[in-house]
Amino acid sequence: GKAAMVLALQHPDLLRRLIVADIAPVPYDHTQSHQIAAMRAVDLSNITRRSEAAEQLSAQGVEPALQSFFTQSLDVAGKQWRLNLDVLEAQMDHIIGFPEVSGQFPNPTLFLTGKDSDYVLPEHRPLIKSLFPGARFAKLPDAGHWLHADKPRAFEAAVRTYLDA
């Protein structure tokens, strides 16, 4: 989401419209390092199925929707995560930050958020509207920040509706 926003703001001519999933163009102070730690805690040496990794993630306190989402990034045969957890951890400050950028993206933009998420707050809307004057907002019920993992069918339906309009 943040990379797509930066692209849209720096090169608005490259995009006709934009969908941003539960993130605002602001720096955040909470990290996802605990999720990385949970993934690192999984003993991959004896894993033969994703469900076994999901069980270990559950023991680390990872909620079911994220267990499924994270285990999609598991190379079971290779006994490794496809994600570079070291780089994600090392770059967390950049991941949770947002660069100083100028410009606007005037084209239609959907900010799709989870109703139970606190990532896109009402106080972010003036900034969002100043950078993305064509912004519209929609919320997925019963979804948090990881809305595509929490409610994949509802997420897909909202995206399709927006793109088909």
Show where each model-derived region lies.
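Short glycine-/acidic-enriched loop or helix-start segments at secondary-structure transitions
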Residues: 4-6, 29-30, 121-123, 149
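Conserved acidic functional residues
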Residues: 21-22, 84, 150
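Short, well-ordered alpha-helices that flank and scaffold nucleotide-derived cofactor binding pockets
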Residues: 6-13, 126, 130, 157, ...
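Active-site micro-motifs of SAM-dependent methyltransferase domains
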Residues: 1, 25, 145
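Conserved alpha/beta-hydrolase catalytic His-Asp/Glu region
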Residues: 44-101
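Conserved serine/cysteine hydrolase catalytic core
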Residues: 77-131, 136-139
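Flexible "cap/lid" loop of the alpha/beta hydrolase fold
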Residues: 5-50
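Catalytic active-site module of serine/aspartate enzymes centered on a nucleophile-bearing elbow/loop
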Residues: 134-165
